[in-house]
Amino acid sequence: DIDHPDIEEFIKWKVTEEQKVASIVTGSKICSNHLKSIMSACHNCEADGESCFEPSKNPALKREIIAARRNEVPENYIQRIIHFAKPGYKSVEFETYNTDWDSEAYVTVSGQNSNNSVRVTDEFLDAVMNDKEWNLVNRTDGSINKTVNAKELWDQVGYSAWACADPGIQFHTTINDWHTCPESGEIRASNPCSEYM
């Protein structure tokens, strides 16, 4: 319900989770590329022995470390690869991910097996049209938890639906105005796509 006290977090939930996927995919590829370059710089150097693993004595290694740091590769991974290269290891496995909906990246985030909807009332839509405040109401005692701008809340719904296709909208007032058996009680939910409405 659009007046639920947790509605803002609910609206943004899947957007945030999909942003995590983008971060996992991008971060894995950035780390993989830089770590391989650091490993290569350790072994393809003109210095002798241990000097190949010291950035002050191996200019190529220094360049690769600087490039990795610029791209936010964690320092512990940079150092780990250098230590891994010292005993002679020449390659490293660093798994990368993709944005396929059935990929490991999507499996690691929440909300991907849900189809979320927000139920909006005519009262809320009027508040949006008239740029009014909207109360988010506690479910346990009916008290006002927070007051937000209705138009801004509606904009959050629109942005989230654009960014990740959720939440869908269920028009609570209209659904119940068209209820074919109102004696059975108010319709409070449907499948998120609302084919049955």
Question: Which ranges hold each PLM region?
Answer:
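Active-site cavity-forming subdomains of large catalytic enzyme subunits
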Residues: 1-197
